[in-house]
């Protein structure tokens, strides 16, 4: 089993954590932007099939 040899410093931990958070934030922002464009109908990259409901 792999075991780290030295303790990771607090500043390095913080740096790694911030990078990880930033990645998540940017992905969430892209997803939100895509959802917004789909809901308004301005999407150029997604084609949503419109289905007509007959009553």
From Swiss-Prot:
Please provide, in alphabetical order, the Gene Ontology terms of the cellular component aspect for this entry.
chloroplast; large ribosomal subunit
Read off the InterPro entries from this record: Ribosomal_bL32, Ribosomal_bL32_plant/cyanobact
**What keywords tag this UniProt record?**
Chloroplast, Plastid, Ribonucleoprotein, Ribosomal protein
Q: Classify the main location.
A: plastid
Q: Which domain of life does the UniProt lineage start with?
A: Eukaryota
Q: Which GO terms describe its biological process?
A: translation
Q: Which GO terms describe its molecular function?
A: structural constituent of ribosome
Compartment(s): Plastid, Chloroplast
Report the sequence similarity comment from the record: Belongs to the bacterial ribosomal protein bL32 family.
The identity of this protein, by name, is Large ribosomal subunit protein bL32c
Q: What is the lineage of its organism?
A: Eukaryota, Viridiplantae, Streptophyta, Embryophyta, Tracheophyta
């Amino acid at each position: 089993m792999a075991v780290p040899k030295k303790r990771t410093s607090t500043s390095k931990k913080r740096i790694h954590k911030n990078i990880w958070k930033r990645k998540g934030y940017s992905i969430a922002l892209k997803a939100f932007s895509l959802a917004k464009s789909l809901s308004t109908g301005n999407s150029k990259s997604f084609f949503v099939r419109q289905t007509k409901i007959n009553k």
